Amino acid sequence: MTSISDSQIIVILLSVFITSILALRLGKELYQ
């Protein structure tokens, strides 16, 4: 297994954070 660097972890966390925000906004628009 290859070791994951800190920069890769930050990028993954940012991408998950952004996608979760977009999903929440889309869900709110569809709910209303």
UniProtKB/Swiss-Prot annotation:
GO biological process: photosynthesis
Gene Ontology, cellular component aspect: chloroplast thylakoid membrane; photosystem I
Membrane-spanning segments: 4-26
UniProt KW keywords: Chloroplast, Membrane, Photosynthesis, Photosystem I, Plastid, Thylakoid, Transmembrane, Transmembrane helix
Keyword Transmembrane found: yes
Signal peptide limits: none
Membrane topology classification: Single-pass membrane protein
Location(s), subcellular: Plastid, Chloroplast thylakoid membrane
Assigned protein family: Belongs to the PsaM family.
Protein name (record): Photosystem I reaction center subunit XII
Organism per entry: Marchantia polymorpha (Common liverwort)
